[in-house]
From Swiss-Prot:
It catalyses: L-glutamate = D-glutamate. The active site is at C75 (proton donor/acceptor), C185 (proton donor/acceptor). Substrate binds at D12, S13, Y44, G45, N76, T77, T186, H187. It comes from Mycobacterium leprae (strain TN). Provides the (R)-glutamate required for cell wall biosynthesis. GO terms for biological process: cell wall organization; peptidoglycan biosynthetic process; regulation of cell shape. Gene3D superfamilies: 3.40.50.1860. This is Glutamate racemase. The keyword Phosphoprotein does not apply. Belongs to the aspartate/glutamate racemases family. InterPro entries: Asp/Glu/hydantoin_racemase, Asp/Glu_race, Asp/Glu_racemase_AS_1, Asp/Glu_racemase_AS_2, Glu_race.
Length: 272
C-alpha cells in the first residue's frame, strides 16, 4: 500500500512539464516531488508513437520502481501515446494531462466551439478529439503548432517572430469562432500571454497544467495519500536525461531558483 510520505512522480519529455510541477507545488506545497525531464530524447512531437512509448515507459518504470505514490505524465504527447499502457502496467494511480483539460474546457465554453493546440503527434493521435467525443453540443477544431516547443526550449517566449508564428497557427481557430482554447502542450503556458494576444481577450485559455494539478489533489485526497503538514521537510528532486546545466537554464523560467540542483537521470529500467 502506498504511503503519504512517498513523493509525487512527474515525467515530461523536457522542461514543459515543469508547468505542471509548478502548479502541483502551488496547490500541494507539502508534497515531495521527483521530476524527470527526458531532455536527452525530447521533444517527443516529431517522434513516432512506438518511439514515444518506449522512451516514456522507460522513465515511468524507473519512477515507479523507485517508489512514488502517484505518477503524473506531464506531457500531452506521451499521454496520448502510452496512457493505457501505464495504467495497466502500474499499481499506483496514473494522472495525465488530457482529460482534466477537456473537462475544464467543456465547463468554460459558452458557444460550444472549442479549440485545441498541440504538437503534431498529439493532434494526429486524436486523443483530445476522442476525449471531447462524449461532450454534447461541442465542435472541436484542433491545430498542430510544432514550432512553439522549439521556441520555448530555446527560451524565446515573446517577440514579433513568435507572435507572427502564433497568428499563422491560430488563424483557423479564429475562423472557427472558438471561445475556448486548450493549451494542449505543457510548454504552451509560457506562451499564454502571446496566444491570448493573438486570439483576443474574449477567448478563454485552458491550461492542462493547472487542471492536472487539481486532479492530483483530488486523487490524493480521495485515497488519503496527502502528506501531512507536520511531515519531514519537503524534498523536491529534479533530473534530466540530457545536459543538466542546459535544463537548469530553461527550468529557471518555469520554477526559478528551486531547480538549481538538477541531477543527471540514471535510468535502470527497460521497456518490456
Amino acid at each position: 500500500m502506498s504511503s503519504p510520505l512517498l513523493p509525487v512522480g512527474v515525467f515530461d519529455s523536457g522542461v514543459g512539464g515543469l508547468t505542471v510541477a509548478r502548479a502541483i507545488i502551488d496547490q500541494l506545497p507539502d508534497e515531495d516531488i521527483v521530476y524527470v525531464g527526458d531532455t536527452g530524447n525530447g521533444p517527443y512531437g516529431p517522434l513516432s508513437i512506438p518511439e514515444i512509448r518506449a522512451h516514456a515507459l522507460a522513465i515511468c518504470d524507473d519512477l515507479v520502481g523507485r517508489g512514488v505514490k502517484i505518477l503524473v505524465i506531464a506531457c500531452n504527447t506521451a499521454s496520448a501515446a502510452c496512457l493505457r499502457d501505464a495504467r495497466e502496467r502500474y499499481d499506483v494511480p496514473v494522472v495525465e494531462v488530457i482529460l482534466p483539460a477537456v473537462r475544464r474546457a467543456v465547463a468554460a465554453t459558452r458557444n460550444g466551439r472549442i479549440g485545441v493546440i498541440g504538437t503534431r503527434a498529439t493532434i494526429a493521435s486524436h486523443a483530445y478529439q476522442d476525449a471531447f467525443a462524449a461532450a454534447r453540443d461541442t465542435e472541436i477544431t484542433a491545430v498542430a503548432c510544432p514550432r512553439f516547443v522549439d521556441f520555448v526550449e530555446c527560451g524565446v517566449t515573446s517577440g514579433r517572430q513568435v507572435l507572427g508564428l502564433a497568428e499563422g497557427y491560430l488563424e483557423p481557430l479564429q475562423r472557427s469562432g472558438v471561445d475556448t482554447l486548450v493549451l494542449g502542450c505543457t510548454h504552451y503556458p509560457l506562451l499564454a500571454g502571446l496566444i491570448q494576444l493573438a486570439m483576443g481577450e474574449n477567448v478563454t485559455l485552458v491550461s492542462s497544467a493547472e487542471e492536472t494539478a487539481k486532479e492530483v489533489l483530488r486523487v490524493l485526497t480521495e485515497r488519503d495519500l496527502l502528506r501531512r503538514h507536520d511531515a519531514p521537510p519537503v524534498n523536491r528532486v529534479f533530473e534530466a536525461t540530457g545536459d543538466p546545466e542546459a535544463f537548469i537554464q530553461l527550468a529557471a523560467r518555469f520554477l526559478g531558483p528551486a531547480v538549481s540542483g538538477v541531477q543527471p537521470a540514471r535510468l535502470h529500467s527497460r521497456v518490456r
